[in-house]
Curated annotation (Swiss-Prot):
Domain ThyX: 5-210
Sequence positions that bind FAD: S59, R83, H84, R85, Q91, N165, L166, R167, H171
Protein name: Flavin-dependent thymidylate synthase
Broad EC category: transferase
UniProt xrefs under HAMAP family: ThyX
Family membership: Belongs to the thymidylate synthase ThyX family.
Residues the record lists as binding dUMP: Q80, L81, V82, R83, Q91, Q92, S93, Q94, R95, R149, R176
This enzyme's EC code(s): 2.1.1.148
Catalytic reactions on record: dUMP + (6R)-5,10-methylene-5,6,7,8-tetrahydrofolate + NADPH + H(+) = dTMP + (6S)-5,6,7,8-tetrahydrofolate + NADP(+)
Co-factor binding comment: Binds 4 FAD per tetramer. Each FAD binding site is formed by three monomers.
Keywords: FAD, Flavoprotein, Methyltransferase, NADP, Nucleotide biosynthesis, Transferase
Signal peptide: none
Cofactor(s) needed: FAD
Amino acid sequence: MDNGIRVKLVNYTKKPLETVTWAALISYWDEWETETFGRMSDKDVEMHLPRVLGYGHESILEHATLTFAIEGCSRVCSHQLVRHRLASYTQQSQRYIVLNPEDVEETFVIPSGIKEDPELLAEWKELMKKSIELYKKSVERGQHQEDARFILPQAVRTKIVVTMNLRELKHFLGLRACERAQWEIREVAWKMLEEIAKNDELRPIIKWAKLGPRCVQLGYCPEGELMPPGCWKRTGEKWKTLFEG
């Protein structure tokens, strides 16, 4: 189902895997050889990076950052996102942007379970329309947007720019790409992974750094009895398609 959430990788550290590999090798060199960065090749990356990450030396991942644009998620979702504090965020302001909605589902995220109940869906939409009407009426009567926004439900869609280093991104994906994560933040997490997979320069790091849910990172499901039936196999197969095609 299309929930109207869009994620785009808009920028990342130049030569990200070379940067991370070079930083790893610096640990073993007697001299400070900055010139060697310019000579880093794909062969050097393939020879050293998987091995170093395999040892668990993940601090080197902090030298590469990725910036994503996320649009159409709810503020329920963005509240979960910003709990990951080792990242940078810039979110669309409800104080300076006047909301001018034309359609309820374009303005608010409605869970699929609600959509499957026609009677309940009608009540939801009615309440959402009422909140929009009161918001617009408040602004028209001279109330500041920063006050009028109080009437809007958490379901209102938002836009947010997120920058994470690769190590924090791995932590984020470990928690939020899991099937037990809330469905909306899980969708965002997998869309971020898909954006990385589309990039030839970045794709190898998915496998080498095990960017994905914790079951992929650990080799077992840490949820124990809470693991959804069939999740282990289903998630593993989905993850492998990111770099195997």
